[in-house]
């Protein structure tokens, strides 16, 4: 019999034929072996036991199937029924996804909490992922009856919220001649909005479509990415940029700030939509996201303030939820991201953390008695990671009108003890193009974001050169000089520890002081202040320009004075005479972007000119 919760929550109806059933032979944690499953397919969705627990077939041998169950298996016994559904694990895609929170297999947590009245998810619960009764404002495009339409064509617009319009596309595998298209009005997800005829067969479609999570959604072609992912974090935007459609990894030990960087990207990046997957991380981190995001606002180009939650979907699969569902949560998240990409949007997907996903793979692999590889992880770990990260990219979308979309994947990795030679980290680094390596020592010094500028890298710098040339022709040279200064500081630190600062040449003292400026007042950023939580790219460029300009002018002044008979210019003299300008360099980060771009650029230009005037006056004095 179906189970009832509060008189409303019912599980799968069990009036199917007996031939659709197998029976449980063995239970080992989340892994169940069932017999009598002849004809079943790999990755087919099944319902296990009298509670109808959701499971997925991961191995077939003869008529026995090995199933990973996405819910707690306590209470399952031998000979319990296993019902086949004849479909793979799929997600529902349609209006209502944004602003929602799902678990790893796309069950809506708010709805379950409201209906069951419990803080925990009842076992075997079956609730539609999207509300089928909610009415949506449907506005058809230029298609009329008699037109030919193919998979991926956008045939209507649905008003999802004040931030985003939901563009309704025909499922990728559909095509035909339109025999009916719904007029403008309000419709639910159960209502037919378009009917097609192909080779004499009529098919009707609603605004809802279903897609198997392990199958990438088809695209017309892949494109080279050339637009930066602006995160609002200076160290990432200026030194190690990613692109819209890129792949990034954030490895770091516990307490280094991976989650804060992931959340900052969700809040402030220039993406149109964000899918945040909490995969096996602490439950209170997801709770923090749920409390913070609805209160956070973003300012649109027309000056409107909108809630960040309106462009965000959360997939919560915390560490106390069943292990097997962690694997599903990553695929659920990327499929939702691909759905919005197909509308022509730029989507970011945060996976926090892929290490927990790999640990779930390791546990299931151990239960299946597979041969372990490095650190007990399965031999196919790298292949699974690659197949996930390869679903990122900038694409030309299927169907018309012609449009481009992108999925950017940012995966946090938690290597034990911060050891980057860990199998998950090394497999991830062989795939991703951007590496934002977090450093425990920087985090202990309270330098956040604790991205180590000596080990991090980005392979997208060349792809973004044309963008930088248009934005600011000087930026590439300034950035190269800043990197040289930071690298030179690292080389000089050993000498300083041996002989002290005073024994250094004047040029080296200037290098050390400039590197300190870059480290403490440029790369470090306070995520909890209104002026520094988000740094627009123009502010990042101007701050770096002024610091490097100070470095160049100071070096030139010292070199010129060295070849003359007058008073020698030393670093101590520069700092003493130009202390006010030095203080203004340090204070650049306190300029609030809320004042507007023109006001801030004016202030930065004035500082640039004042630096020129200050050094000119100093050289005149010492002649």
From Swiss-Prot:
It is an enzyme of class 7 (translocase). It catalyses: ATP + H2O + 4 H(+)(in) = ADP + phosphate + 5 H(+)(out). GO terms for biological process: ATP metabolic process; Golgi organization; pollen development. Its EC number is 7.1.2.2. Catalytic subunit of the peripheral V1 complex of vacuolar ATPase. V-ATPase vacuolar ATPase is responsible for acidifying a variety of intracellular compartments in eukaryotic cells. GO terms for molecular function: ATP binding; ATP hydrolysis activity; protease binding; proton-transporting ATPase activity, rotational mechanism. It is found in: Vacuole membrane. It comes from the Eukaryota. ATP binds at residues 252-259. GO terms for cellular component: chloroplast; chloroplast envelope; cytosol; Golgi apparatus; mitochondrion; plant-type cell wall; plant-type vacuole; plasma membrane. Pfam families: ATP-synt_ab (PF00006), ATP-synt_ab_N (PF02874), ATP-synt_ab_Xtn (PF16886), ATP-synt_VA_C (PF22919). Its main location: membrane. Belongs to the ATPase alpha/beta chains family. NCBIfam families: PRK04192.1, V-ATPase_V1_A. It is a peripheral membrane protein. V-ATPase is a heteromultimeric enzyme composed of a peripheral catalytic V1 complex (components A to H) attached to an integral membrane V0 proton pore complex (components: a, c, c'', d and e). Binds to the deubiquitinating enzyme AMSH3. This is V-type proton ATPase catalytic subunit A. Keywords: ATP-binding, Hydrogen ion transport, Ion transport, Membrane, Nucleotide-binding, Translocase, Transport, Vacuole.
């Amino acid at each position: 019999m179906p189970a009832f919760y509060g008189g409303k929550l019912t599980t799968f109806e069990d009036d199917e034929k007996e031939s659709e059933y197998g029976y449980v032979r063995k239970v080992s944690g989340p892994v169940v072996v069932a017999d009598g499953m002849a004809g079943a397919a790999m990755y087919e969705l099944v319902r296990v036991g009298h509670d109808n627990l959701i499971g997925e077939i991961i191995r077939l041998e003869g008529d026995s199937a090995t199933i990973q169950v996405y819910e707690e298996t306590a209470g399952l016994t031998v000979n319990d029924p296993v019902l086949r559904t004849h479909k793979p694990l799929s997600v529902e895609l349609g209006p209502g996804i944004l602003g929602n929170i799902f678990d790893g297999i796309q069950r809506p947590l708010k709805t379950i909490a409201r209906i069951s009245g419990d803080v925990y998810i009842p076992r075997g619960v079956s609730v539609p992922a999207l509300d089928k009764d909610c009415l949506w404002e449907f506005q058809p495009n230029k298609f009329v009856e008699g037109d030919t339409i193919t998979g991926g064509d956008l045939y209507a617009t649905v008003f999802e919220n004040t931030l985003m319009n939901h563009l309704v596309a025909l499922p990728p595998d559909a095509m035909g001649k339109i025999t009916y298209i719904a007029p403008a009005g309000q419709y639910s997800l159960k209502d037919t909005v378009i009917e097609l005829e192909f080779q004499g067969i009529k098919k009707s479609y609603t605004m809802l479509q279903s897609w198997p999570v392990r199958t990438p959604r088809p695209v017309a072609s892949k494109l080279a990415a050339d637009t930066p992912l602006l995160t609002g974090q200076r160290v990432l935007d200026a030194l190690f940029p990613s692109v819209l459609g890129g792949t990034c990894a954030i490895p770091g030990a516990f307490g280094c700030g991976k989650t804060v960087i992931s959340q900052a990207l969700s809040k402030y990046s220039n993406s149109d939509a964000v899918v945040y997957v909490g995969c096996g991380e602490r439950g209170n981190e997801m709770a923090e996201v749920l409390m913070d995001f609805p209160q956070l606002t973003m300012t649109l180009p027309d000056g409107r303030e909108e809630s960040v939650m309106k462009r965000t979907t959360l997939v919560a699969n915390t560490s106390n939820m069943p292990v097997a569902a962690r694997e599903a949560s990553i695929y659920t998240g990327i499929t939702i991201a691909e759905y919005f990409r197909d509308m022509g949007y730029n989507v970011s997907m945060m996976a926090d953390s892929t290490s927990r996903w790999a640990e779930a793979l390791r546990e299931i692999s151990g239960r299946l008695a597979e041969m372990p590889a490095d650190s007990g992880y399965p031999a196919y770990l790298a292949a699974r990671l690659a197949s996930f990260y390869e679903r990122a990219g900038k694409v030309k979308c299927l169907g018309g009108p012609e449009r481009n979309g992108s999925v950017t994947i940012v995966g946090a990795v938690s290597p034990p003890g911060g050891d980057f030679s860990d199998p998950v980290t090394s497999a991830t680094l062989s795939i991703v193009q951007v590496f934002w390596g977090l450093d425990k020592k920087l985090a202990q010094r309270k330098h956040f974001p604790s991205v180590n500028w000596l080990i991090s890298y980005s392979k997208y710098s060349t792809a973004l050169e044309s963008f930088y040339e248009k934005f600011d022709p000087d930026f590439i040279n300034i950035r190269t000089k800043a990197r040289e200064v930071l690298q030179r500081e690292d080389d000089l630190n050993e000498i300083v520890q041996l002989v002290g600062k005073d024994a250094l040449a004047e040029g080296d003292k200037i290098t050390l002081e400039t590197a300190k400026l870059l480290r403490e007042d440029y790369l470090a950023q306070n995520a909890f202040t209104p002026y520094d939580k988000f740094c627009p790219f123009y502010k990042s460029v101007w701050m770096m320009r002024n610091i490097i300009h100070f470095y160049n002018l100071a070096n030139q002044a010292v070199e010129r004075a060295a070849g003359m008979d007058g008073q020698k210019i030393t670093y101590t003299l520069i700092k003493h005479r130009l202390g006010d300008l030095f203080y203004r360099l340090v204070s650049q980060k306190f300029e609030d972007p809320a004042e507007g771009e023109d006001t801030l650029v004016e202030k930065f230009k004035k500082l640039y000119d004042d630096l020129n005037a200050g050094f000119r006056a100093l050289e005149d004095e010492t002649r």
